[in-house]
Design a protein with these regions (language model features):
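N-terminal Rossmann-like NAD(P) cofactor-binding subdomain of oxidoreductases
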Residues: 1-175
Length: 175
């Protein structure tokens, strides 16, 4: 979906289709809906090499991978917009408890900006790391924020009861 959105943006040019699983395979062979739209091959996701070539790197990786790759050299050259949860949570202990993995870049958590533009637009513009919000949180925050901002609800009593199909949060169907 990210590729489709970027391809339709007048100011975006995709330079690199990174993948660890599909290196040297045509992107459209992996993602058939891109047949006759994308003629590029997937390349290894060497972020240090890529940082010299682009203004922004989008990562759409499993939890933990972006945090294990990001470093000061990369961030000195480009911005990162991370679609995983690696920089969404400001408490490393909560992240590690929830995802059952050690956070590999806790030094960047405080500077990462939660990328909900409706609330953090100015911070997103200047951030080196943008933590792309997930679907549940976006829905929940955009629903409650205007009411909370005006003091119309008590946040300590707020309950969000949300449901998902089998593909929610990147999960597949399994028993």
């Amino acid at each position: 979906e990210l590729v489709r959105i970027l391809m339709g943006h007048k100011d975006a040019e995709i330079k690199w289709y990174g993948s660890r699983s599909y290196v040297d395979q045509k992107y459209a062979d992996v993602y058939r809906n891109m047949f006759q739209i994308v003629d590029a091959k997937c390349m290894d996701d060497n972020m240090e090499e890529l940082a010299d070539q682009v203004d922004v790197i989008f990562t759409a990786t499993p939890q933990g991978l972006c945090a294990s790759l990001v470093n000061e050299e990369i961030l000195s050259k480009t911005k990162i917009i991370d679609l995983s949860a690696d920089f969404r949570l400001k408490d490393v202990n909560v992240y590690e408890e929830w995802y059952k993995i050690e956070h590999k870049a806790p030094q960047y958590i405080d500077e990462a900006v939660y990328g909900l533009c409706e609330i953090n637009r100015d911070l997103v513009k200047s951030a080196r790391i943008v933590a792309n919000p997930g679907c549940y949180t976006t829905c929940s925050i955009l629903t409650a924020y205007p009411l909370a901002k005006e003091g119309l609800i008590d946040m300590s009593t707020l309950i969000i009861d949300a449901k998902s199909g089998t593909s929610g949060a990147g999960r597949g169907a399994k028993l």
